[in-house]
Structure formats: C-alpha cells, structure tokens
C-alpha cells in the first residue's frame, strides 16, 4: 500500500516540500533563516491576533487600550513584547536571509529572488503601519513624516497623502485604516511566502559552492528538519531573553507618551530596521530625490541578477568581491547608526558618504570586481 503522505492530495504537497525534498548535502547554517522567517511570521500572526482581541483602533482609546493589554490582560505584557520584539527578530532574519542570497549568488534564481524583494517591501509596509497603532508620540509623528514623503510625487502627491490620511492630517481615519492594513498584510505575506517556496522548489536550493548539486542530494527530512528545529530553538531562546530581560531595548521612549499633534519630539525617527533607508533619505537635500533614493535603496535588490558579471555564482572563491560584500555590510550598519543621529555635522557628511558608497558598491564596484576576477582566473 502507498504511504498516505505520498498519495493524499494535500499531504503530497507537504511531502514534496518538507519531507522527500531533495536538498544539497552541503548547505550551511546560513540556509536556516528561511525557516526562521516562517517561524517569525507564525509568531507575529498568533501574538497579533491575541493583541487585536483587546486593541481598539480609535485615537481616543488606542493608547489606553495598549496600556490595558500590558496591565490588565493575562500575560498581555508578554504577548505585546513578543510581538514588538518579534518584529525586530523578523527583520534581523530578513536582512541575513537577503545577505546570504547576495553572498552565495542565490539572486540568479530571479523569480524566487524578485518575490523575495516584494516580500521585503510588504513586510516593511506592515511594520510601518503596525508602529503607528500604539498611538504614542513616535507613532503619530513617524506616520506624519513618512506618509508626507508621498507629497513629493509630482502632480498627485498632496492628493495622494490626503487620500491615505483620510483627511487633512493623521487622525482617526488614518489609525483605523492602518489597523485594517496591519491585520490583512501578514496573510498576504504568508501567501507570497508559499509562492516564494513554489518557485524555489522549481529549481532546488543553491549551495555555498554555487555549483550544480544534482549528483549529491539528501532528503530534507530528517537532516534539515532537525537542523531547522535547532535553529528555531536557539532563536526562540534569543527572543525570550530579549523579551524578559530588556523588552524596551529596541523601542523608543517617546512612544510611552500619548500622541500629541501640538508637540513635536526633538528627533523623529522610525524603528531601527528602517534607519538605513531613513539615513539615505535624509542624506539628499531635495525632497523628491530623497524619496527616490529611499525606494531605490530596496528596489536595487531587484536588479542584482542583471549586475552579475562573474563566471562564479558564489563569492566563496572571489576574494575581491568578498571584501566589497563585507564593506557593504559595514556600510549598512553605519547608515543604521546615522539614521538614529540628529541632523548635524559630522553625521550629515558621514550619511552622505555612506549613501553614495551603498549605491556605488552595488551598481559599480561589485560588477567591476566580478570582471577583474574573471580575468584573474585566466592567468
């Protein structure tokens, strides 16, 4: 008799995706972050669901409803902080996952890669609208400043901003629709993640060598299921430590003050995971130019397959490109730091240099390094 997992229409899909899937025998721990992202998404949807049961999306009661969750709901403080810090963990995993894709040339699976870029955009949108919901000072002013950037779009800008706000300022209508978006978007992310996996399983996983591994495959279960479970266990340990010992480490103290349209905080800044893009936005004096640079800082990932010039797929055997990759990582960390600093010298200059270097590395230096390395192979 055929095993039910191989014959049942639903189980068959799961079997081909997680049990009998042929996987390269040499994929390292950098390949764990896909499953960790799946875990983060499930944690966020579950904690978010329980938070939504007690939250009210009204400007008069939103802040006090979050206080009520933390003080009066059974383990409400835990659910709230797991959700808030889970978002940070989500982005850490996202950045590492995308970084691994760049390092090992996984972007050459262009369908999988481009869906990943779309997923990154939607996740950033979800996190942004979610940050507005507690209706603290930074929530309100963050929403005002970031949505206002759309007014830089020629002709339709100001109309578009008022349309998103649902009025002439960030108010009740804005909060209600942001809550609606924040509730629906994670399910769209989950659906797209399935499409992401579908395209990945069309080609099979890449591996650290960047070589075709058809001759040396092992079944996903039990080898990689155990490996993924270990990764999940360690990640949950990290999240638990953060939530129980310093839950406000990555948050902004200003968000413990209720939103006040008449009082602007001295430094308006988004959550830490947007700071690199925010620094690029601020480094350009022109408003429209800044918005274009902000969008391009993420959209640039979509053209990475077109910028690949090397004969090698992975950076494992390409020392010059390796150096440039780690300079790019350092540059992103520098931008993240600058995004959280006030707009004054020397931070302005450092931000401008780091922004130019960011685009220069991806668009010019890495493709040139690939060509140089091709030439060196022939010697």
UniProtKB/Swiss-Prot annotation:
A biological process term (GO) from this entry: mitochondrial electron transport, ubiquinol to cytochrome c
Transmembrane segments: 33-53, 77-98, 113-133, 178-198, 226-246, 288-308, 320-340, 347-367
Gene3D superfamilies documented for this protein: Cytochrome Bc1 Complex, Chain C
Pfam families linked to this entry: Cytochrom_B_C, Cytochrome_B
Protein known as: Cytochrome b
Binding sites annotated in the UniProt record for heme b b566: 97, 196
Family: Belongs to the cytochrome b family.
Cofactor, how bound (note): Binds 2 heme b groups non-covalently.
Keywords on record: Electron transport, Heme, Iron, Membrane, Metal-binding, Mitochondrion, Mitochondrion inner membrane, Respiratory chain, Transmembrane, Transmembrane helix, Transport, Ubiquinone
Transmembrane helix among keywords: yes
Predominant subcellular localization, coarse grouping: mitochondrion
SUPFAM superfamilies assigned: a domain/subunit of cytochrome bc1 complex (Ubiquinol-cytochrome c reductase), Transmembrane di-heme cytochromes
Membrane topology type: Multi-pass membrane protein
GO molecular function: metal ion binding; ubiquinol-cytochrome-c reductase activity
Protein residues bound to heme b b562: 83, 182
Miscellaneous information on this protein: Heme 1 (or BL or b562) is low-potential and absorbs at about 562 nm, and heme 2 (or BH or b566) is high-potential and absorbs at about 566 nm.
Gene Ontology CC annotation, any one: respiratory chain complex III
Role, per record: Component of the ubiquinol-cytochrome c reductase complex (complex III or cytochrome b-c1 complex) that is part of the mitochondrial respiratory chain. The b-c1 complex mediates electron transfer from ubiquinol to cytochrome c. Contributes to the generation of a proton gradient across the mitochondrial membrane that is then used for ATP synthesis.
Residues where a ubiquinone binds: 201
PROSITE patterns, alphabetized: CYTB_CTER, CYTB_NTER
Cofactor(s) needed: heme b
């Amino acid at each position: 008799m055929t095993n039910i997992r191989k014959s049942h229409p639903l189980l068959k899909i799961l079997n081909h995706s997680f049990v009998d899937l042929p996987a390269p025998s040499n994929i390292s721990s950098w390949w764990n972050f896909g499953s960790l992202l799946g875990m983060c998404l499930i944690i966020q949807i579950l904690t978010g669901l329980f938070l939504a049961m007690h939250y009210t999306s009204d400007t008069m009661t939103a802040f006090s409803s979050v206080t009520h969750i933390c003080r009066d709901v059974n383990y409400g403080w835990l659910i709230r902080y797991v959700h808030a810090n889970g978002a940070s963990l989500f982005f850490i995993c996202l950045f590492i996952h995308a970084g691994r894709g760049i390092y090992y040339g996984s972007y050459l699976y262009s369908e999988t890669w481009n869906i990943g870029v779309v997923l990154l955009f939607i996740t950033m949108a979800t996190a942004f609208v979610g940050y507005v919901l507690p209706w603290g000072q930074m929530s309100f002013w963050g929403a005002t400043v970031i949505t206002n950037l759309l007014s830089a779009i020629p002709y339709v800008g100001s109309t578009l901003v008022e349309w998103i706000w649902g009025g002439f300022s960030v108010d009740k209508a804005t909060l209600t629709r942001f809550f609606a978006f924040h509730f629906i978007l994670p399910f769209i992310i989950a659906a797209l993640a399935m499409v992401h996996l579908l395209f990945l399983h069309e080609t099979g996983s890449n591996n650290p060598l960047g070589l075709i591994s058809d001759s040396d495959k092992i079944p996903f279960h039990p080898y990689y299921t155990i490996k993924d479970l270990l990764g999940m266990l360690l990640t949950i340990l990290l999240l638990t430590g953060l939530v129980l010992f310093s839950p406000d480490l990555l948050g902004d103290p200003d968000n413990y003050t209720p939103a006040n349209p008449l009082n602007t905080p001295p430094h308006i800044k988004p959550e830490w995971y947007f700071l690199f893009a925010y620094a690029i936005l601020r480094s350009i004096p022109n408003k429209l130019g800044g918005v274009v640079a902000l969008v391009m800082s993420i959209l640039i990932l979509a053209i990475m397959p077109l910028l690949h010039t090397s004969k090698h797929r992975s950076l494992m055997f390409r020392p010059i490109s390796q150096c440039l990759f780690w300079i790019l990582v350092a540059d992103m960390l520098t931008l993240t730091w600058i995004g959280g600093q006030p707009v004054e010298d020397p931070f302005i200059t450092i931000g401008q240099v780091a922004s130019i270097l960011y685009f220069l590395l991806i668009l010019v230096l890495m493709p040139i390094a690939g060509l140089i390395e091709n030439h060196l192979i022939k010697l």
